């Protein structure tokens, strides 16, 4: 679909201006997770996937309806939300802490609830500035709702990566152009 093409273009443009060894998750015309400068492609894919997951979790009703104190500023809200959804809710929801941020003590956003919510995410685009050397990158990307991938290709294991994409019903395009800065 046109939206996938747009999102892949956004991801690839983002990667062109990012430190080498990078991947970018994109959806709705915006980059939602970038993993850059790591020592391996899978580390980039995990890092960017984690950021994309956080972006999606911020859209959950449980997060959108947090009962913040009206005096709490935007930067503090952002930090509290990050702690709340990234398994550090004791820092913001524990007795003695929640009163600094909320009108009432929020219910925890459990790992099970988060996994269930994220399992419904679909249609995410993923760009890579170089080939995926192993299918583990595809496995990790699938967990974050990736459906469309653009990468240069050229790995001796391209067949295994393509097979993994096929197994998950993903569309992958080879750009035949690396976006490395070196």
Annotated model-derived regions:
Residues 39-182:
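Feature captures the catalytic cores and cofactor-binding loops of soluble hydro-lyases/lyases
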Residues 1-21:
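Short, basic/aromatic recognition patches
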Residues 14-17, 25, 115-118:
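Short, conserved, surface-exposed binding loops centered on an aromatic residue
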Residues 21-29:
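Short beta-strand scaffold segments in enzyme catalytic cores
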């Amino acid at each position: 679909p046109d939206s996938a093409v747009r999102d892949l273009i956004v991801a690839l443009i983002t990667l062109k201006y990012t430190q080498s060894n990078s991947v970018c998750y994109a959806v709705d015309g915006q980059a939602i997770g970038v993993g850059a400068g790591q020592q391996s492609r899978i580390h980039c894919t995990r890092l960017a996937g984690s950021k994309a997951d956080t972006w999606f979790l911020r859209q959950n009703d449980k997060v959108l309806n947090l009962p913040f104190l009206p005096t709490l500023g935007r930067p503090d809200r952002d930090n509290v939300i990050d702690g709340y959804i990234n398994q550090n809710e004791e820092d913001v929801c524990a007795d003695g802490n929640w009163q600094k941020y909320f009108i009432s003590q929020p219910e925890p956003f459990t790992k099970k609830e988060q996994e269930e919510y994220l399992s419904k995410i679909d249609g995410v685009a993923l760009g890579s500035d170089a080939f995926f050397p192993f299918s583990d990158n595809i496995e990790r990307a699938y967990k974050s709702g990736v459906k469309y991938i653009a990468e240069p290709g050229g790995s001796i294991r391209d067949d295994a990566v393509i097979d993994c994409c096929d197994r998950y019903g993903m569309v992958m395009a080879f750009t035949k152009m690396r976006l490395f800065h070196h």
